[in-house]
């Protein structure tokens, strides 16, 4: 069990029951932690329209506006138009554990889509679909209620009044560019809102949008 450094709350491990597969994906290179420095792990609930980096020549919002911690880097990416959990660390081994192939690290997303997916669409997501960069690995996919912990998005999503929306819980074991969005579009239900809830044992539990906390690894 992990303990927060700046919060009295304790982290709850995230269950991946019914979302298990046998193959896992590749990710980017990692950074090494300088010798003799303690491992630092930052959990950040990234708002919409914030880049997952500390600098941007174009002047867009970055992590620097929220996190006054130096020497930590994101494990994987979370697109500017996506929200939710970003794990930052100075430990390359931890980055590898969260992102590299064969590490068996699932990533849970809550996804608001246009329309109500059919069982055939859900089965296609679970079994893998063929995108322009090849077939996806099997994934967890289920229809769920709107999350009780959901925060308002600014700006709100654009939705058509004549078409209902619904929420999916999707668990991936690979990290392709904009993969969730491409997968739901492929089966006919475009993504309207995308929130990453968990990476391995790390989750958004008790972490408000735009807030961060440090945890022990």
From Swiss-Prot:
It catalyses: uridine(2457) in 23S rRNA = pseudouridine(2457) in 23S rRNA. InterPro entries: PsdUridine_s_RsuA/RluB/E/F_cat, PsdUridine_synth_cat_dom_sf, PsdUridine_synth_RsuA/RluA, PsdUridine_synth_RsuA/RluB/E/F, PsdUridine_synth_RsuA/RluB_CS, RsuA_PseudoU_synthase, TruA/RsuA/RluB/E/F_N. GO terms for biological process: enzyme-directed rRNA pseudouridine synthesis. Residues 19-28 have a biased composition (Polar residues). One of its GO terms (molecular function) is rRNA pseudouridine synthase activity. Residues 19-38 are annotated as: Disordered. It is an enzyme of class 5 (isomerase). Changing residue 79 to N/T: Loss of activity. Transmembrane segments: none annotated. Keywords: Isomerase, rRNA processing. Belongs to the pseudouridine synthase RsuA family. PANTHER family: PSEUDOURIDINE SYNTHASE FAMILY PROTEIN-RELATED, RNA-BINDING S4 DOMAIN-CONTAINING PROTEIN. This is Ribosomal large subunit pseudouridine synthase E. It comes from Escherichia coli (strain K12). The lineage of its organism: Bacteria, Pseudomonadati, Pseudomonadota, Gammaproteobacteria, Enterobacterales.
